C-alpha cells in the first residue's frame, strides 16, 4: 500500500472512531453510554421506589415512599463487568419497623458510621437509621420545606464526609422568583443546594435554577417538575437529576423528560478542602452543564414511561468507567401498566 493510501486509511479510521464514540449524549470530554432500562418483575416486588443507595459489594438499599411500613428494602444487583448492563435484580429482604411510613425519598449510606440517612417528605426530616431499620437519635438540622415539594434528594460526599440535599420545588420565599420571565426572576425553579457536615450540622446553601418547564401543566391530569435526586461523583462533581413529568387526562401520551446535570463542587468548596464558601446572593446561581438526557413515554404501542427518582453510584468497570444506577417509581405498578424500571448509565 502506498503512502497516500496509508494516509487515507488512517484518516478513515480516525473518522470511523469519531463517529463511533460521538453522540449528542457526550459532553465536555465525558463519555456516556446508556444501557437502557430493564424490569425484574419476577424477582423484585412491586413498589414505589424513590431512592437507592449502595451498601457495599452487590447489595443496595431501596427507599419505598408508599410502603405499609417504615424502613427500606435490600436488593442484590448484578452487572456485566464490561458493559455495565444490569443482568439481575434480586429481592433479598425488607427491613421494616412498626413505625408509619415517612414517605421515604432520598437514601444514602454513610460508611464511617455504617448507618443510613433517609429523607421523609411526610415529616420533612432527614433522619438516621441503623441497618436493622431503627431510627437513631440523629437527624439533619433542616429549615422548613414546602409541603410535598419539600426535601426529596440526598447525596453523600465520602471524600469530605458532607451530605447534600435539595428541595424538589422552591421554598415559599423563592416561589415569586421562579417560573417567571420578569426582571430579577428565573424561567425555572429557584432551589437551594444545601450542605451538612459529618455531625449533620448545616454549613451552607447555594442557589440552583432548573430548566424552564416545556409542558402546559394547565392541561395536565398530573404534572411534576424539579430536582428528584443528587449524587456526588468522585471528588469534584455533584450530579443533579432534573425531571419533568406530564400526564394528560387520557393518560396516553404521558411522558417524562430526565436530565442529568454536572455541577462543579469547586463552586462550593475552597480548593480540595472540606471548607465551603457559601453564596448568599441569588443573582448568581451555580453553573451547571448537561451530562445526559433521555425521555420515556406511554403510548398505545410503547410503555417505557418511567419516573426516575433514585440514582446512585454502581461499581467501576474493567476499563475504569463508572456505572450510575437509577430506579423509577412505578406507583406500585399502577393500573398494571407502569413498571419498576432499573437503568444503568456509564460515564468516564
Q: What are these regions, as identified by a protein language model?
A:
Residues 27-348:
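Sequence/structural signature of beta-propeller domains
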Residues 1-30:
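Bacterial Sec-dependent N-terminal signal peptides
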Amino acid at each position: 500500500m502506498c503512502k497516500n493510501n496509508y494516509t487515507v486509511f488512517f484518516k478513515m479510521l480516525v473518522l470511523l472512531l469519531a463517529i463511533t464514540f460521538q453522540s449528542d449524549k457526550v459532553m465536555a470530554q465525558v463519555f456516556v453510554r446508556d444501557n437502557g432500562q430493564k424490569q425484574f418483575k419476577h424477582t423484585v416486588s412491586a413498589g414505589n421506589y424513590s431512592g437507592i443507595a449502595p451498601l457495599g459489594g452487590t447489595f443496595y438499599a431501596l427507599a419505598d415512599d408508599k410502603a405499609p411500613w417504615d424502613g427500606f428494602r435490600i436488593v442484590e444487583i448484578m452487572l456485566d463487568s464490561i458493559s455495565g448492563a444490569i443482568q439481575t435484580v434480586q429481592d433479598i429482604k425488607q427491613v421494616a419497623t412498626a413505625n408509619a411510613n415517612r414517605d421515604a425519598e432520598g437514601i444514602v449510606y454513610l460508611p464511617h458510621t455504617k448507618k443510613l440517612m433517609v429523607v421523609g417528605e411526610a415529616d420533612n426530616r432527614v433522619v438516621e437509621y441503623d441497618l436493622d431499620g431503627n431510627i437513631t437519635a440523629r437527624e439533619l438540622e433542616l429549615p422548613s420545606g414546602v409541603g410535598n415539594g419539600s426535601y426529596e434528594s440526598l447525596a453523600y460526599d465520602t471524600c469530605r464526609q458532607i451530605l447534600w440535599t435539595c428541595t424538589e420545588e422552591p421554598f415559599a420565599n423563592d416561589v415569586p422568583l421562579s417560573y417567571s420571565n420578569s426582571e430579577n426572576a428565573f424561567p425555572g425553579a429557584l432551589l437551594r443546594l444545601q450542605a451538612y457536615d459529618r455531625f449533620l450540622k448545616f454549613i451552607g446553601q447555594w442557589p440552583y435554577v432548573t430548566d424552564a418547564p416545556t409542558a402546559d401543566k394547565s392541561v395536565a391530569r398530573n404534572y411534576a417538575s424539579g430536582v428528584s435526586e443528587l449524587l456526588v461523583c468522585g471528588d469534584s462533581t455533584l450530579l443533579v437529576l432534573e425531571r419533568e413529568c406530564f400526564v394528560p387526562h387520557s393518560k396516553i401520551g404521558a411522558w417524562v423528560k430526565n436530565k442529568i446535570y454536572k455541577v462543579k463542587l469547586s463552586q462550593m468548596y475552597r480548593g480540595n478542602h472540606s471548607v465551603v464558601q457559601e453564596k448568599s446572593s441569588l443573582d448568581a446561581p451555580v453553573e451547571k452543564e448537561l451530562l445526559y438526557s433521555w425521555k420515556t413515554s406511554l403510548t398505545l404501542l410503547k410503555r417505557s414511561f418511567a419516573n426516575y427518582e433514585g440514582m446512585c453510584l454502581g461499581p467501576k468497570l474493567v476499563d475504569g468507567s463508572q456505572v450510575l444506577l437509577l430506579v423509577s417509581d412505578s406507583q406500585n405498578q399502577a393500573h398494571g401498566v407502569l413498571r419498576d424500571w432499573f437503568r444503568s448509565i456509564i460515564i468516564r
